């Protein structure tokens, strides 16, 4: 199992504008797949996020309300499939690409999906990605309405690569981390820290 994280300093990705969401995903996955290259035809990628790319959605909505010309790049990147498509091209990944949303901790949902995908004998490994942006007024209100953990304190993405023969990791309760530190990424951040050998985020 390989793990990597990306934070607010993630470098930009050509063709993606304004939002940190896609650069975060790209950097975390790039770090994993560079450290652990493999057969892209037998690799799946699964991305999970509670709020998705709220920056792009909010910016596009504000421009629409203001009567401004719509930016086609914002339309293109408004779904998380866009950055998965970019990564599949960069790393020749031709297996399934999936995007999920859950209001609970993302780790359990991603690991359950990985187990299901690896029942397919044509797949050998799965790249798991969790990503959340720091809260805005709108998303913080949405988290309250959903009665879920809430947004992370800063933009963050976590990626793991799990091979078929790896012992499948299991999340465990975080080490007293304040809920606002990592939001719905808490389980993934703690799991990545264990895999990296630091045992603490």
Where are these regions (language model features)?
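Conserved "HGTGT" condensation-loop signature of ketosynthase/thiolase-family condensing enzymes
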Residues: 1-74, 78-108, 112, 116-120, ...
């Amino acid at each position: 199992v390989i793990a990597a994280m990306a934070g607010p300093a993630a470098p930009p990705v050509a063709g993606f504008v304004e939002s940190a969401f896609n650069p975060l995903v790209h950097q975390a996955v790039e770090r994993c797949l560079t450290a652990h290259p493999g057969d892209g035809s037998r690799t799946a990628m699964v991305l999970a996020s509670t709020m998705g790319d709220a920056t792009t959605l909010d910016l596009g909505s504000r421009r629409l309300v203001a009567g401004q010309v719509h930016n086609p790049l914002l339309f293109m990147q408004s779904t998380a499939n866009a950055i998965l498509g970019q990564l599949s091209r960069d790393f020749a990944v031709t297996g399934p690409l999936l995007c999920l949303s859950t209001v609970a901790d993302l780790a359990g949902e991603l690991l359950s999906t990985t187990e299901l995908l690896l029942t397919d004998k044509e797949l050998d490994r799965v790249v798991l990605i969790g990503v959340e942006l720091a809260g805005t007024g709108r998303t913080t209100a949405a988290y309250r309405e959903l009665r879920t953990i809430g947004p992370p304190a800063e933009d963050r993405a976590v990626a793991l690569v799990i091979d078929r023969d790896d012992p499948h990791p299991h999340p465990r309760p975080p080490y007293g981390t304040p809920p606002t530190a990592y939001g719905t990424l808490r389980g993934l951040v703690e799991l990545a820290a264990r895999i990296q050998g630091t045992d603490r985020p």
